[in-house]
Every structure is written in structure tokens, then in C-alpha cells.
Amino acid sequence: MPSFDVVSELDKHEVTNAVDNAIKELDRRYDLRGKGSFEFKDKTLTLTAEADFMLEQMIEILKLALIKRKVDIQCLEYKDSYASGKVVKQEVILREGIDKDLAKKIVALIKDSKLKVQAAIQGEQVRITGKKRDDLQEAIALLRGQELGMPLQFNNFRD
């Protein structure tokens, strides 16, 4: 029976490259040189700047760097900025994996579409099976057309 998996993954190497490019861009900009920094650990990116407007500019630099490296910026989750001494900090979480709420939403979308496929939640992914390859391709088109707030990838397509 044909099937595929719906996942949400990040290419960590591309994210690291994008952060490195953002750091280089920060050093190139005259107005931001030496006044801000990016710190990347695991799935958390900490932005440090002298003022809020600099922080906003750094976020834009980061977004542009991620887009250039073909990383979907929907995976970014912004925490509130906070003052720490003379600097302002903000954490950006890189979300990965499909959480239970989103998985339930995907399953509900598939069921409501009346396609002849079944969706099952398996940890941080959703497995969709059907009798025909065409039905699975319709399910992929349906999910791509929806705005779910997370970048989705479709892999492990089996006939």
C-alpha cells in the first residue's frame, strides 16, 4: 500500500551557515559593527544588541540569511526581548518536528477532505497511506495549500 510521511525538519548545517552569514553581515554594517552579536546553541539563537531597533535590524538580517540558504522562516519562534544590563537580548527558538496539536490538525484536514487516504500520528511525524498514488499526491497538494504555521516536508514516499 503506497504511503508517505509528513515531517518538519531543519537542515542544521544550512542553519549554521545562515547564522555565520548573518554574523558576517553584522560585521559589515557600519551602524551595527561591534554593537550586536548572534549566539547559536542547539536549537536556540540568542541575539544581543544595545537597543531594540538594533535587535529588529538583526532579526531582519537573520531572516534574509535564512532565506538565502533556503531555510523556511516559519520554523522561527520569537521570545520576548529583555534587558540585561546595558544590552537587550532576545531568544529565537528553531522549531523542528510536528507537535501533537499540528499533527491532529493535519489528520483532521485529511479526514475532512474526503480523500481515500488514512492519516496516522507517529511521534513527530504523520504517516499517510492510501490505495492509489494519485490520492497521495492529492493529499500532498492539499497540505501544501494550507497555512499551518510550520514548514512541512514529505519524505519516505513508497509505492
From Swiss-Prot:
HAMAP family in the record: YajQ (MF_00632)
Pfam families cross-referenced by the UniProt entry: DUF520
Full protein name: Nucleotide-binding protein Avin_13410
Keyword Nucleotide-binding in record: yes
Similarity-based family: Belongs to the YajQ family.
One term of GO molecular function: nucleotide binding
Organism from which the protein derives: Azotobacter vinelandii (strain DJ / ATCC BAA-1303)
Alphabetic keyword roster: Nucleotide-binding
